[in-house]
């Protein structure tokens, strides 16, 4: 699974940088789609059902994207996951996508420990 998630995450990060999209906005949209899907059993059942044609799955995706106002590159990315039957990996792909964006932007996660409680200005 790790190679699947990293492959798709890197590919989508390539799109973000090649098309000069706003990484933060694109990540937020991707997280929103993942949260929406995670919160809807019915949506998952449709997207994962092999008996439902991909065209119908993409039509449902288009309705969601249109209603939420998500970008076309995000729509296309999710459509690729649907078409390649990788939609079940959406959540870990989005998490890996976040790590990939952070890596490319030079961000690193840090844990800060203080001997005393810090105030808001600090």
Question: Model-flagged regions — what are they?
Answer:
Residues 1-122:
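Elongated, mostly alpha-helical coiled-coil "stalk/stator" tethers of large membrane protein machines
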